[in-house]
Amino acid sequence: MSRPKHSKFRSIFLPPLTDASDRMQRRRVILKGISAAVGAGLSMPSLAQSTLPVVRIGYQKFNTLNILKETGYLEKALAPLGTKVEWREFLVTSLVTEAITAGALDIGHASDGIGVFQQAQGKGLAYLASESPYPEGVGFLVPSHSPIKSIRDLKGQKIAIGRGYNTHYLLTKALEANGMTNSDVDIVYIQLPSDHLAAYQAGKVAAVGLWDPFLAAAQVATDSRLLFDGTGFTGNRTYHFAQPNFAKAHRDVVKIIFTELEKANQWAQRYPNEVIDLFSRQLKIPPDVITLATKRRRYGLTALTPAIAREQQDLADVFLRLKLIPKAVDVKEAFLNLDVV
């Protein structure tokens, strides 16, 4: 496989923090953009008296909670309630949900699989809302010269994925759709995306499963071909979680958070070039990587629906069959519909 095209390729997988001047500059740009994007399209919810002095929000970069943080709009919206905002960044969203269950956070986002693991472990987290599906944001790459041309050609091949990751679910669904199971391939479980790429580039595996922005980074920086993505197999959703007692007790705060978050989503959908600029500067990765990821991403916040429950239930059932979770779960039992989206 050819060497990376970008000298900053490694930084894509280990993004550093940005400085204060960059944050202030981006905040001014986003504030103007969101004002133009939403106009009067979203009304503010009526504000009931809140007894919450601080709301603690956990987030990971490359997410719309991150965009919302940059604007400062949430702080202004919550000011009449006397509620301040404390933002806490996490490298992986599994730590976000762990912090919520431990009482160190009030609300945060995580991937679909993490929600299933938390429920199976009896953590008591509640799903509050979902982001729009992002099926093209997860996929499998093979070298451009590889003889592997279809999913069926993966039979007997070594494939790098993360155990219990979105790539694990996607691979399982794709194989089953082609009359195979995981036992028909040689799965190599790897935890970190940087290690995924190292094994792939060293030729130790025939294919690698990744998710954006790491998938886009690998597509840009290596001589690879996308074998398949999540289209038709997975929604690859992000969900927002909280402890149910917190969400019920502070529904006014939760509703304001989601109102402002949807404004950030609308802005991101309407102004992709600004999103590219924001994330490429913030993550310190080449703009063409974020451009590729942004083109296939649809931003939006949605209420929990029966269709979403069925989608998430299938993931839970697959993980049970793969013995990734210790017991069956009914996903609907963890859905908390408070009419906040």
PLM regions and their residue ranges:
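N-terminal secretory signal peptides
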Residues: M1-Q25, K32, A36-A40
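Cleavable N-terminal signal peptides
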Residues: A36, S46-L47
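Short, glycine-/small- and polar/acidic-enriched structural segments
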Residues: Q49-T181, I187-I190, H196, A206-D212, ...
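Small-molecule pocket liners
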Residues: L65, Y134-F140, S224-R225, N236-H240, ...
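Pocket-lining segment of extracytoplasmic ligand-binding domains
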Residues: G113, I187-R281
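Secondary-structure end/capping motifs
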Residues: A249-L324
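Conserved C-terminal helix/tail region of periplasmic/extracytoplasmic solute-binding proteins
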Residues: F319-V341
